[in-house]
């Protein structure tokens, strides 16, 4: 197995830098070495061009190495092999084969710098030199005398090595806050805003280093391989000039015609249900590209233009997100209404000159629930069918509740969603005491009236659903979708809007009503936003939009 941290490789790199004829050739040699690097990048960078150094200690170490190796600092470029090491008049036997590693040398040099006396440093060098070749010792001398980089600046080394140091270290994502007044976007960003389609998929941060790729989720965890199958090859083709980058993107499952499939179809089992489906990646931001960082200071306009200049779109596989420049409130409003009329999840609004701010909510997001004073929010009146115990201080309390509705055709209760009560501790305790007499731990064989997937069986189940309370559950979006719940309904971001003591099981929403409500909701939403967008005469947000 290849050892990317072999000090022999470090020696070879240093010699190639010395042998290079000009500055660009040195940069090319360094870049080639790190093209598929898998070692300790931080230590390599510190040995080549340390960010900080102890000048006094390094001067003392340089003098010591000049003495024991019998060479001058200025002669390093012309030194070849067959060096001898002599300490206190005694020759130190050197190794014929290099066995040491970069981490060992890094630790050794730090120990040398931390040693107080010359005699202690000589002792450490004598011990370490016994396992070194003459080339190893020459390279260590180059490191302590600040000659390992052979004239490359610290900025050169940082630029060429840092992408691999950053590799596998995800950057906290920039975030968006809910927007209920479009005017507030232009108040914060008077220079104008970039309005972008919000895709109904999963956010992913893409790292490329040479031929290697890593994918991280919104929570900075590795993305399962089945969700990014084929993306490496398509990204390589889409960015043919890229040596390294960090991109922000959204992955969405699309069918053979390029139409987006419902949220949740990125899962392994769901993918199997769509034989012609595949992953499409929508790129919307650039954090780093070919060694240049665009974090914190670079305007979005510029970052977007970098992407436009570099990408070769692959339709249905790797494309830029649909985005449009807006300068007035009417332009912003029309884009939002037109986008929502297509059934998109929402829009994201960003200042044209805004920087990429990790972990900060500097962007705005708008969904249909944020418009029309919440009149377009989907709600269902559902019955509490079960409960799950919480964790931590809520370990003995009902913390999450299973909501469901009656299928009147089969007279069976189906599950719709799980929801947190949103109550404070005292109120949650009172609610638990109220509901506990109406519930019991389910037996292995579930009652005939209850249709529930095994993964959703609650810790406590209603003894009689007709005696359970009704709650109004709101969500950002409601779709017909066969998933974890048996009703075939998906509620995105469900929450308890209010308790409904005025209703009982007979007046709650049943399955047939829920299905009709979903159809009506989707149709009414599209009609509403299509009407609001009738004066909009710009390009369709479903197509790739270019900045002027």
UniProtKB/Swiss-Prot annotation:
A divalent metal cation 1 binds at residue 250. The active site is at residue 198. It catalyses: ATP + (deoxyribonucleotide)n-3'-hydroxyl + 5'-phospho-(deoxyribonucleotide)m = (deoxyribonucleotide)n+m + AMP + diphosphate. A divalent metal cation 2 binds at residue 345. GO terms for biological process: cell division; DNA biosynthetic process; DNA recombination; double-strand break repair; lagging strand elongation. It is an enzyme of class 6 (ligase). PANTHER family: DNA LIGASE 1/3 FAMILY MEMBER, DNA LIGASE 3. This is DNA ligase. It comes from Lymantria dispar multicapsid nuclear polyhedrosis virus (LdMNPV).
């Amino acid at each position: 197995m290849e050892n990317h941290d072999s000090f022999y490789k470090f020696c070879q790199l240093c010699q190639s830098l010395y042998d290079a004829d000009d500055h660009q050739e040195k940069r090319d040699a360094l870049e080639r070495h790190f093209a598929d690097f898998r070692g300790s990048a931080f230590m390599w960078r510190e040995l080549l061009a340390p960010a900080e150094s102890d000048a006094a200690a390094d001067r003392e170490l340089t003098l010591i190495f000049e003495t024991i190796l019998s060479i001058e600092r200025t002669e390093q470029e012309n030194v070849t092999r067959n060096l001898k090491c002599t300490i206190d008049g005694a020759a130190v036997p050197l190794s014929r084969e290099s066995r040491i590693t970069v981490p060992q040398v890094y630790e050794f040099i730090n120990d040398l710098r931390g040693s107080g006396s010359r005699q202690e440093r000589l002792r450490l060098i004598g011990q370490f030199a016994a396992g070194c070749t003459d080339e190893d010792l020459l390279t260590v001398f180059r490191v302590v005398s600040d000659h390992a980089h052979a004239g490359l600046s610290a900025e050169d080394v940082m630029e060429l090595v840092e992408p691999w140091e950053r590799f596998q270290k995800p950057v906290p994502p920039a975030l968006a806050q809910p927007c209920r007044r479009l005017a507030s976007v232009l108040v914060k960003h008077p220079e104008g805003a970039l309005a972008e389609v919000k895709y109904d998929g999963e956010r992913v941060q893409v790292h490329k280093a040479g031929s290697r790729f890593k994918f991280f989720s919104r929570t900075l965890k590795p993305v399962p391989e089945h969700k990014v199958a084929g993306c490496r090859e398509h990204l390589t083709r889409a960015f043919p000039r890229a040596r390294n980058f960090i991109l922000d993107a959204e992955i969405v499952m699309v069918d053979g015609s390029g139409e987006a499939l419902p949220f949740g179809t990125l899962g392994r089992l769901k993918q199997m249900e769509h034989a012609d489906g595949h992953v499409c990646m929508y790129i919307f931001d650039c954090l780093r590209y070919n060694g240049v960082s665009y974090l914190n200071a670079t305007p979005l306009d510029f970052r977007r233009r970098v992407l436009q200049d570099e990408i070769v779109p692959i339709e249905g596989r790797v494309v830029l997100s649909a985005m449009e420049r807006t300068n007035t409130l009417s332009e912003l409003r029309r884009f939002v209404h037109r986008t929502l009329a297509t059934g998109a999840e929402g829009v994201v609004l960003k200042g044209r000159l805004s920087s990429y701010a990790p972990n900060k909510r500097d962007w705005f997001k708008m969904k249909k629930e944020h418009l029309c004073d919440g009149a377009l929010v989907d709600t269902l009146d559902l019955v509490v069918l079960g409960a799950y115990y919480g964790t931590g201080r809520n370990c003995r309390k009902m913390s999450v509740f299973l909501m469901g509705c009656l299928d009147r055709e089969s007279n069976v209760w189906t599950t719709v969603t799980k929801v947190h009560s949103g109550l404070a501790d005292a109120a949650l305790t009172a609610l638990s005491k109220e509901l506990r007499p109406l519930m019991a731990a389910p037996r292995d064989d579930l009652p005939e009236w209850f249709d529930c997937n095994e993964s959703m069986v609650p810790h406590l189940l209603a003894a009689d659903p007709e005696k359970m309370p009704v709650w109004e559950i709101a969500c950002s979006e409601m779709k017909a979708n066969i998933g974890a719940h048996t009703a075939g309904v998906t509620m995105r971001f469900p929450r308890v809007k209010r308790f409904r003591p005025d209703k009982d099981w007979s007046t709650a929403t049943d399955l047939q009503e829920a299905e009709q409500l979903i159809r009506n909701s989707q149709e009414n939403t599209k009609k509403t936003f299509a009407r609001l967008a009738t004066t909009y005469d710009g390009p369709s947000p479903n197509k790739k939009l270019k900045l002027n």
